[in-house]
Amino acid sequence: MAAQPSGETSDACCDGEDNEDREPEQLWQVAKLRRAAFSGVLLTASLVAAWAYPLWPVVLGLKALALAVGASTFVPSSLKRLAEGRVGVGTLMTIAALGAVALGELGEAATLAFLFSISEGLEEYATARTRRGLRALLSLVPDQATVLREGTETIVASTELHVGDQMIVKPGERLATDGIIRAGRTALDVSAITGESVPVEVGPGDEVFAGSINGLGVLQVGVTATAANNSLARIVHIVEAEQVRKGASQRLADCIARPLVPSIMIAAALIAGTGSVLGNPLVWIERALVVLVAAAPCALAIAVPVTVVASIGAASRLGVLIKGGAALETLGTIRAVALDKTGTLTANRPVVIDVATTNGATREEVLAVAAALEARSEHPLAVAVLAATQATTAASDVQAVPGAGLIGRLDGRVVRLGRPGWLDAAELADHVACMQQAGATAVLVERDQQLLGAIAVRDELRPEAAEVVAGLRTGGYQVTMLTGDNHATAAALAAQAGIEQVHAELRPEDKAHLVAQLRARQPTAMVGDGVNDAPALAAADLGIAMGAMGTDVAIETADVALMGQDLRHLPQALDHARRSRQIMVQNVGLSLSIITVLMPLALFGILGLAAVVLVHEFTEVIVIANGVRAGRIKPLAGPPKTPDRTIPG
């Protein structure tokens, strides 16, 4: 059979040849199915010949050819594996076919080879089809790109792009690789990568990614990655590498299937030997061969891999990267979700919404002092403060006080910026409380130990946050918010989002400790930015990185990466994984049930070789078809709705 989607082959089942270099898109393109069809034609011709004009040499010749053609799909690879000391279902089928020939049942052997070759081909086709879901990301990259060479636009192959090249991207064209916009503005369609339907406005200095579709503007983009190392290629490489990690269902199936094959061979030998001593040798040898086929765990061995690859491929097309079967199964068991506030529940784009002053200071003076201390910081709060003022003078001797704020010198005077508690809010205490109740973070500004003012910075909730939280709670998930912000601000934002369990003023190690406590009670996922929340992500059963597109660290750190900025992908991924896990359980249960039913029927001679093969391979087709169902996932229905909420401030 075809190679397992994980990149490994299971000795219990997959005895087939390597997949064709080009993955088949149509049934007729599968070589094994073409051979199976030819085998079926020969077998049918032998039956017609036996009925219409019984020349037995012709009939036997047709059956022998049907057997040879069908067996060519699994016997060569089975013998090769046997020489390497490995046995699988193909080995069982080979023994059964040879045994049937030895007993003079050439028609039975040909039927077995024909039916088994069909299942081999169907599995190869299904595996290739599901694998294409992930690999389809690479097809988003165009074969050619336009670059500036010595001032002239030149068309080159995407594989010939080098870091530093200047790409020209015209309206409607896809970006051939990652880069930074040097000139031009446009709205990029990134739906095929992140699953978000709303185009993203970009301009000079913005980072853009391979596979994005340019809107109406003409862009000049500086190339930052080659075709082999762009964001899409790295994503596919990371996910495919992680697919070797197997989940509980796959490990269970492997634990049953691998030892089952040699056990079946031993049991069949005992049945044949004991039956030959106590009864008719021919009858019991034939029954032993039927038992050999009846207990073959091929459907069991493919029950999970086909489902895993179909599910991961479908999710990847909507901007949800699930790193392997283990991550998929764990995602399907999650019952509690811990959400980081900044960058997950909020957009991580804070703005200054209010400035309160005292001791004769002006609004601009307060902002100028704060900006001087934050001038060299890249913290989101610093970005908000710097964007709110035109002041450009930077403070000197700036030192950070962990968990408190900044201290430095400006125009020869000592200035401080920090949270209430480290600095005394004094007469601004009521203003600070009002800011925090409005969901803002308040910072105080002081000069020469004299309070100048308080600045309120608020990072707005994502418009879809309340909808997502409500959906999670309706689905039975326990939702908790974790943040390093103060209690008042955290409580205000949590109330807007509909979250009841809130933990504030947490350091990274505190978040990890709380996640570990949640995990001790029930399966828990931690959702964060994948970088600053690394300890908490590692402490959870499953780490989910939000907005991971272009962030290699996030993709590598987390088990699941939501490539876009739409939080609705979180419940979408959870529901998809839960459904996929249910399909895995169905497949494993059906496979084991069929083996359990067929074994006694074969042992007591109720079913013959052809009937057992037919039932067994029909089961495999059902398992494959059921697994492919995991590839169905509905895209998000339009952009998130902005809630109508008024916040006092």
Where are these regions (language model features)?
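Bilayer-spanning, highly hydrophobic alpha-helical transmembrane segments
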Residues: 39-44, 252-279, 287-296, 305, ...
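Conserved cytosolic catalytic loops of P-type ATPases
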Residues: 136-229, 326-370, 409-410, 521
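P-type ATPase nucleotide-binding
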Residues: 170, 352-478, 487, 496-515
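Membrane-embedded alpha-helical bundles of multi-pass transporters
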Residues: 6, 13-14, 48-55, 75-78, ...
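Actuator/coupling domain of P-type ATPases
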Residues: 2-4, 15-27, 47-50, 57-144, ...
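Conserved catalytic phosphorylation-site environment of P-type ATPases
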Residues: 90-97, 130-134, 143, 193, ...
